[in-house]
UniProtKB/Swiss-Prot annotation:
GO molecular function: mRNA binding; structural constituent of ribosome
Main location per the UniProt record: mitochondrion
Record bears the keyword Mitochondrion: yes
Role this protein plays: Component of the mitochondrial ribosome (mitoribosome), a dedicated translation machinery responsible for the synthesis of mitochondrial genome-encoded proteins, including at least some of the essential transmembrane subunits of the mitochondrial respiratory chain. The mitoribosomes are attached to the mitochondrial inner membrane and translation products are cotranslationally integrated into the membrane.
Subunit record text: Component of the mitochondrial large ribosomal subunit (mt-LSU). Mature N.crassa 74S mitochondrial ribosomes consist of a small (37S) and a large (54S) subunit. The 37S small subunit contains a 16S ribosomal RNA (16S mt-rRNA) and 32 different proteins. The 54S large subunit contains a 23S rRNA (23S mt-rRNA) and 42 different proteins.
Protein name: Large ribosomal subunit protein bL12m
Record localization: Mitochondrion
Lineage: Eukaryota, Fungi, Dikarya, Ascomycota, Pezizomycotina
PANTHER family linked to this entry: 39S RIBOSOMAL PROTEIN L12 (PTHR45987), LARGE RIBOSOMAL SUBUNIT PROTEIN BL12M (PTHR45987:SF4)
Protein keywords: Mitochondrion, Ribonucleoprotein, Ribosomal protein
Family: Belongs to the bacterial ribosomal protein bL12 family.
Lipid biosynthesis keyword on record: no
Species the sequence originates in: Neurospora crassa (strain ATCC 24698 / 74-OR23-1A / CBS 708.71 / DSM 1257 / FGSC 987)
InterPro entries documented for this protein: Ribosomal_bL12, Ribosomal_bL12_C, Ribosomal_bL12_C/ClpS-like, Ribosomal_bL12_oligo, Ribosomal_bL12_oligo_N_sf
Any single Gene Ontology cellular-component annotation: mitochondrial large ribosomal subunit
């Protein structure tokens, strides 16, 4: 009789272990396979709710005021090459309105690779690769297609550093 009690106890223990393994694996599965987002901060959820009720015009005003308050510069979308043609037509009306501030000192510059010494070509390619974050092949094509705009909206201090570094390597870069 004690054998049957022991056997029953062992069976019960096995079933208990199996059921706890199954339930714990279900909890782990639910946690890792869940697509439900974690609970958001109530303050942020309220802001998101308010923003979602804004119209398109109100949203653009919100974005522009946030950019001005947080000092975020207007960067061209799609990189410097894609933004150059789109920026030219939009700049014409802005130039007429801002004729007086044009006399003030410029703070943002466009850097243009004009030419380079043939002997310094590998060094120039390497520097362009580092500055623009291009691959080696893209950098080589970029340098060989000079004159070409390197960067736009560069602060004066950074622009002067880049021009000096490129001049040391044997390249001519202009600041416009």
């Amino acid at each position: 009789m004690s054998l049957s009690v022991r056997f029953a106890a062992q069976c019960a223990a096995r079933q208990l272990r199996a059921s706890t393994r199954a339930s714990s694996s279900l909890l782990v599965q639910k946690r890792f396979e869940s697509t439900a987002a974690p609970a958001a901060n109530p303050k942020i959820a309220a802001i998101v709710d308010q923003i979602s009720t804004l119209t398109l015009l109100e949203t653009s005003e919100l974005v522009s005021s946030l950019k001005s308050r947080l000092n975020i510069p207007d960067l061209p979308v799609g990189g410097f090459a894609a933004a150059a043609p789109a920026a030219a037509p939009a700049a014409a009306p802005a130039e007429e309105e801002e004729a007086a501030p044009a006399a003030a000192e410029k703070t943002l510059f466009t850097l243009k690779l004009e030419k380079f010494d043939a002997a310094a070509k590998p060094k120039v390619i390497k520097e362009v690769k580092n500055l623009l974050g291009l691959s080696l092949v893209e950098s080589k094509k970029f340098v060989e297609s000079a004159p070409k705009v390197m960067k736009e909206s560069v602060p004066k201090e950074d622009a002067e550093k880049i021009v000096a570094a490129m001049k040391e390597l044997g390249a001519t870069v202009t600041m416009d």
